[in-house]
Amino acid sequence: MPDGWRKMGVLVFYDLPVVSPEQRLAAVRFHKFLLADGFERMHYSIYARYCGSMERAATYERRVEQALPAVGHVNLLKLTDRQMVGMRKWIRGNYRAPENAEFVPPAQYQLF
């Protein structure tokens, strides 16, 4: 199997209810778990992590499963290195980050 098919990345998408204080706390805890576990926030509820191998991707899949809140919708998508490289990001127009948002430089990844 070619190398680019063995190296993996993981995307986590979630939609969690935040109606009650307990649900908000669970959503915040899940968000903080993902950041502490090395995931990079790509969008409001989309997080990505480069894993390097299928085995490590499976490890992070188990870790996310163990951290799931009691209520909500969470998807995990495993992508090959070649699929991750094909991802594109555009920010257009007069987009500005909120005033209270702090800039966090992206993590440096070693891809090869």
Curated annotation (Swiss-Prot):
EC numbers for this chain: 3.1.-.-
GO BP annotation list: defense response to virus; maintenance of CRISPR repeat elements
InterPro entries: CRISPR_associated_Cas2, Virulence_VapD/CRISPR_Cas2
GO molecular function (one): metal ion binding
Keyword Amino-acid biosynthesis found: no
UniProt-annotated binding residues for Mg(2+): D15
Keywords assigned: Antiviral defense, Endonuclease, Hydrolase, Magnesium, Metal-binding, Nuclease
Domain of life: Bacteria
Cofactor(s) required, per the database record: Mg(2+)
Known function: CRISPR (clustered regularly interspaced short palindromic repeat), is an adaptive immune system that provides protection against mobile genetic elements (viruses, transposable elements and conjugative plasmids). CRISPR clusters contain sequences complementary to antecedent mobile elements and target invading nucleic acids. CRISPR clusters are transcribed and processed into CRISPR RNA (crRNA). Functions as a ssRNA-specific endoribonuclease. Involved in the integration of spacer DNA into the CRISPR cassette.
Family per record: Belongs to the CRISPR-associated endoribonuclease Cas2 protein family.
Description of how the protein assembles with itself and partners: Homodimer, forms a heterotetramer with a Cas1 homodimer.
Protein name per Swiss-Prot or TrEMBL: CRISPR-associated endoribonuclease Cas2 2
Organism this protein belongs to: Rhodospirillum rubrum (strain ATCC 11170 / ATH 1.1.1 / DSM 467 / LMG 4362 / NCIMB 8255 / S1)
Source species taxonomy: Bacteria, Pseudomonadati, Pseudomonadota, Alphaproteobacteria, Rhodospirillales
